Amino acid sequence: MHFKWNYESPTPEQQKAAEELGAKLNMSPVLAHLLIKREITTESAAKRFFRPQLSDLINPFLMKDMDIAVDRLNDAMGRKERILVYGDYDVDGCTAVALVYKFLQQFYSNIDYYIPDRYDEGYGVSKKGIDFAHQTGVKLIIILDCGIKAIQEIEYAKSLGIDFIICDHHVPDDVMPPAVAILNPKRPDDPFPFKHLCGCGVGFKFMQAFAKNNNIPFSRLIPLLDFCAVSIAADIVPVVDENRILAFHGLKLLNTNPSIGLKSIIDICGLNGRELSMSDIVFKIGPRINASGRMENGKLSVDLLVERDYSSALRMARHINEYNKQRKDIDKQMTEEANGIVSRLESMKHNSSIVLYDEGWKKGVIGIVASRLTEIYFRPTIVLTRDGDMATGSARSVTGFDIYSAIKSCRDLLLNFGGHTYAAGLTLKWDKVREFRDRFQHYVEEHISPQQTEPMLNIDAEIDFKDITKHLQADLKRFSPFGPCNQKPIFCTNRVYDYGTSKVVGREQEHIKLELVDSKSSTVLNGIAFGQSAAARYIKSKRSFDIAFTIEENIFKKNQVQLQIEDIRPNEG
């Protein structure tokens, strides 16, 4: 894929601000410019950014209903009521359940957890789950990463004498469920200043408030921060402010003393012995936690995350690793089928969105396929499969387009839907799928801009090879953890040449291993361009080209840097 490069040279005002900030922080203008672009303009803000402090976490009692939630939990414990921690079957839900269950279990034994079966119960609160709670004597359900739209289900639970505390981060409807307390920073009446917590983050704030109210030292929560880091990375929420603090300290824990369950996954992934990043969570750890819920039942992942014995955890980790291998095979097959449909249908090539459906696609994998199609075609995408006389779908969007609002515009055709700006899920009658497709595509056509369907690469700065040093790479690491709203800085260098040894590599000859020289300074650097072998012929033609890249540590030669090439284009100068 060739990107449109979005790069604006710094204004004189920005240059001056970067120079002043760089002088105060003893930092190069390049790094200071990156801070200015992130709207970090003062010395104190920069120190908070580079050294996030747990003491700067927001008071959890600023969240609407937090005092009510803590009081109800205290009452349940005082009365020795049975408590059920209930959560979604994805990474965010599983880590949230593990965090809340592990923390409360230290102080209270009459507690259990429950993850609904994706295939038998579907998303969110299920009647089967409530019946299980009723049969086992549960009086309070703490529900995490779902529940904000479960009006009928929670009314049913209420009729059985079961109370709910909802900890969710998805967009609520105008009418909310009759829960005892609803913790959700996206509530329009919620004054909590940070709106981008994930489900596990909301669960953490609840436990933080409970600890504060009961004079439990905050240090008892710190061993659970690795769950927060995993959920923040996997749920792709903005890594700023509160999330940056939680991710920073959670990642630190993941690298030094992870929980037994996460350690077993790290070992199964072959990641032990190296410094873990948010990317390792997104591409290695997260998919394995997700795999059990995609292929069978997510409870296995929570069993693993709360396990205290390493040998038992390792056995479970091997089990979910097998699920992940199966998921990858199905994912590859479904993506090829979906891609084939788009390629064959001429009309689809001109639409601003993609809606695909097939009776045989696996429900647990359609979200991944939607993500892949969005990356390939850069259009809002919905992939649906059949479940009896119902259709279940997953939606993914492109930067700047609110797919939740697009789905909401068709709500009269839907039985259920939920999510947020860039990802959502929906359920409708199978015989309504075509009408939904037409309405959804019409809405997208009316509301999306051409720029939003154009692959865009945001360049942070132009740089000469001579300025790319090991010291710079080490300084760039201080900007981590990376993620939405704090992406890894992308640089560009114009007029570079092949130094003569660049070659195509990889099992399927899909990558290029590069040795490049900068025309300005004659500095030579190594790089890798994943999936860009189509550019090899041009590179070997001895003509100049421009590259966009991130600056990485060479994992084989620790004292050297390596460029990870994001895009290659002919130089037009």
Task: Go through the PLM ranges and name each one.
Residues 119-121, 150, 170-175, 189-191, ...:
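Short gly/pro/ser/thr-enriched loop/turn and capping motifs at secondary-structure boundaries
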Residues 75, 171-184, 516-521:
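Acidic-glycine-rich active-site phosphate/pyrophosphate-binding loop
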